[in-house]
Amino acid sequence: MEFLWAPLLGLCCSLAAADRHIVFWNSSNPKFREEDYTVHVQLNDYLDIICPHYEDDSVADAAMERYTLYMVEHQEYVTCEPQSKDQVRWKCNQPSAKHGPEKLSEKFQRFTPFTLGKEFKEGHSYYYISKPIYHQETQCLKLKVTVNGKITHSPHAHANPQEKRLQADDPEVQVLHSIGHSAAPRLFPLVWAVLLLPLLLLQTQ
């Protein structure tokens, strides 16, 4: 039964470690005015796209922002022009939905069991652009997502210089000697005596 807990524990740990990165996809988001709006993620993180939403009637329906989002290659990202309808990723087309703004999510996973799912690799960048539906839009909304590699730190990279001055014979310093020695616990002389006593008694009989 205990073997069943291992995959469940691993799944829980991976879910707990995943981050969610939120992007509000509308023309009023100042981040889209940056030249290279980039979000950095790790594998198994999520990207949440929040679509435009209007809670009152102050904006005419024809003026409400609606977008078709595409996942494209770098050159199409630069020109902000998709090449195929097959590149359509999502549609933000319910700006006045009663349940609130639409949320579209992408999981950056190495493998996916779904036919329409996307697979991502560490060290690669992925590109999203949008084209307006109905309304006129002069600004190109586009996003670059980079999947970072695993962060590794050298054990001595951030060592405290003060720690290097500590001497091994300092009574307040506990030094663990692990290099060149067995990891098995050492047996004290009294323990050896207890273990050898039965052998000594057998020899005397």
UniProtKB/Swiss-Prot annotation:
One GO cellular component, as annotated: side of membrane
Domain Ephrin RBD per the UniProt entry, residue ranges: 18-151
Secreted as UniProt keyword: yes
GO function terms (MF aspect): ephrin receptor binding
Lipid attachment locations (GPI-anchor amidated serine): 182
SUPFAM superfamilies per UniProt: Cupredoxins
Compartments where located: Cell membrane
First and last residue of the signal peptide: 1-17
Biological process according to GO: angiogenesis; aortic valve morphogenesis; axon guidance; cell migration; endocardial cushion to mesenchymal transition involved in heart valve formation; ephrin receptor signaling pathway; mitral valve morphogenesis; negative regulation of dendritic spine morphogenesis
Matches recorded under InterPro entries: Cupredoxin, Ephrin, Ephrin-A_Ecto, Ephrin_CS, Ephrin_RBD
Cystines in this chain: 51-92, 80-140
Protein name, UniProt field: Ephrin-A1
Native source species: Rattus norvegicus
